Regions:
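Asparagine-centered polar/low-complexity signal
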Residues: 5, 28, 34, 313, ...
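Short, proline-centered helix/strand-breaking motifs
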Residues: 15, 53-56, 460, 478
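Extracellular, repeat-based ectodomains that mediate carbohydrate processing or recognition
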Residues: 21-440
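Low-complexity, Pro/Thr/Ser/Gly/Ala-rich linker/spacer regions in secreted
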Residues: 437-449
Length: 545
């Protein structure tokens, strides 16, 4: 059958499914359907999600849950034990005393599979509960501190080679001068806690502490140093780490500068937003083992533009030095499009995954959710819209100026990403997710070399007047790595007529990008085909003028 006939048949098949393909068949990931973890009429916000360290079928998520009549705040408990096929749980953590719960959960699963949850209370303080039956029942409350504080975040040492294997950590900002980061540890699955200790002694108040495990028992924390007057804009990022289980910390109060977005976002119904840092570390044993990544939301400080952008900084030497900022979102700079609330996760292959709210494909009063994925430590990014419906952010009445939640989250399990976020498409803010299958992770963990042919989806798409097409020629083996082969990249219209040849030359192994300028062509659907001696793939793109 001729190429022309094949393309015509392909066109007839795909035209009715254009929207579905744009949402669900994206490059090297397969995006499923959006669904709620625990459908209810309760407001659900500020979600976290973690995976069991030795049983990837078990995933645990928690969030703020708010009931208004009578007014009650608790922590949702949402669990799957079958890899995400089904979820169970409750909008109320059942650890006594239930009436004294106050939300703001921090969660972890330790080496024994014990769920540990920290929360604030009806009065000042930080409290914890644990579950040894996958969230079905919970312990009575354990008091960690009676201080007034910002929510705690948690991590657990699940690396058997670590001298602190099994220890779990909680970190938070204390709401008293000088507003330092504090922490406590538990060695018995949350049954008892160490006396809280101070990590840093900031000149400018700390905000938004985050914590994660590195290799060899190292623990890393980060926070934002904020300005001294409202709106307390994030001014720089501080980082600290301990190599001895928290006995001592090496502190860098200003690891790198930032310019955050703390305040109200007028374009989104005056919701409250922030630029607080989120940290992740590669512990895969691959080529970027030990790399540390911190993501923030910034504007008016390069590489961020005049609109809020997602910015990544990384350290390849254990936090001793930090890269310049890397702009993650790939939409045009200063285009009046807004990205905010990023969450970061390194999967088992060393892939770097970020989710964030983004309005590039909708109106300025609405938002969708995007995934950005890098398989080379943040040098190059692929982006995918993962929400199948946009929503209009609005504050939740009665919960403080502009409140609709302050963070989202992401984890991975069994070759799938599990992002979680809140949106109000059903009328109430609810926690949503979507399984994202990493269908063909193509970077060799040992060599860091590309091992599969790839033809990426063009970006932007739809486009006007130009778009970029990225493709990959793999390394076959060491003896053939320098060999080249003939590569053609051609564009066809819907009738199968060749429009232009973008490339017709020999290429060696590597990642390439070609720009297609369509200013002389009419609007419509086009197809681009990559052909080599051993690989052929065709994708569609839409020109809208």
């Amino acid at each position: 059958m001729s190429l022309k006939n094949l393309i015509i048949i392909f066109f007839l098949c795909v035209v009715p499914l254009i929207n579905a393909q744009q949402n669900n068949n994206k490059s090297n990931v397969i995006i499923g359907d959006n669904f709620r973890l625990h459908p209810s009429n309760v407001s659900q916000t500020e979600v976290f999600i973690v995976t069991h360290p030795s049983n990837p079928d078990i995933i645990f998520s928690s969030c703020n849950t708010i009931i208004f009549n009578p007014f009650f705040v608790s922590e949702g408990v949402y669990v799957t034990t079958n890899g995400g096929n089904s979820w169970y749980g409750s909008d109320t953590c059942k650890g006594a005393p239930i009436t004294l719960h106050g939300g703001d959960p921090g969660i972890t699963i330790n080496k024994d599979g014990t769920f540990i949850l920290t929360r604030i209370g009806f009065s000042s303080g930080l409290y914890s509960h644990y579950s040894i039956d996958n969230g079905m029942t919970w312990s009575n409350q354990k008091t960690i501190t009676n201080d007034d504080l910002e929510r705690a975040t948690m991590t657990s040492d699940v690396h058997p080679s670590s001298p602190y294997f099994g220890r779990s950590y909680a970190a938070w900002v204390k709401f008293a001068p000088p507003f330092p980061l504090n922490f406590a540890v538990t060695d018995d699955s949350g049954d008892s806690w160490s006396v809280p200790a101070q990590i840093n002694n900031p000149i400018q108040r700390s905000s938004g502490g985050d914590i994660t495990m590195g290799p060899d028992g190292k623990v890393y924390v980060c926070w934002a140093g904020v300005t001294s007057v409202s709106p307390f804009t994030e001014d720089f990022v501080g980082v600290a780490f301990t190599t001895n289980g928290g006995s001592n910390w090496q502190v860098t109060e200003n690891a790198f500068d930032m310019n955050g977005i703390n305040g109200l976002l007028t374009q989104k119904g005056n919701i409250r937003v922030n630029g607080l840092p989120n940290i992740a570390i590669d512990t895969t044993g691959g080529p970027r083992h030990g790399w540390i990544y911190i993501v923030t939301t910034q504007k008016n400080l390069a590489p961020a533009g005049s609109d809020p952008d997602i910015i990544l900084n990384r350290s390849t030497d254990g936090g001793q030095s930090w890269s310049a900022g890397i702009r993650v979102n790939q939409d045009p700079l200063n285009n009046e499009k807004i990205q905010y609330f990023p969450a970061i996760h390194v999967d088992k292959t060393g892939g770097l995954n970020l989710i964030f709210y983004d309005d590039r494909n909708t109106t300025s009063d609405s938002s969708g959710v995007f995934l950005a994925r890098s398989e080379d430590g943040g040098n190059n990014w692929q982006e995918f819209e993962i929400s199948d419906k946009n929503y209009k952010p609005v504050p939740i009445g009665g919960l403080g100026q502009g409140y609709q939640g302050d963070n989202i989250s992401i984890t991975s399990s069994n070759g799938k990403l599990w992002p979680v976020w809140m949106d109000n498409r059903t009328g109430d803010y609810q926690i949503w997710t979507v399984p994202i299958e990493l269908s063909s992770v193509y970077v060799d963990e040992t060599t860091g070399q590309v091992t599969e042919f790839r033809l990426e989806q063009n970006y932007p798409n739809p486009f006007n007047p130009s778009t970029k097409i990225k493709f990959t020629i793999p390394y076959v083996n060491a003896s053939e790595a320098k060999q080249s082969e003939l590569v053609t990249l051609k564009v066809y219209d819907v009738l199968g007529t060749e429009v232009v040849t973008l490339l017709n030359e020999k290429k060696s192994a590597g990642i390439y990008e070609v720009e297609f300028d369509a200013r002389q062509l009419p609007s419509g659907i086009y197809f681009y085909q990559l052909r080599t001696e051993s690989f052929t793939n065709t994708k569609k793109m839409v020109l809208l003028k």
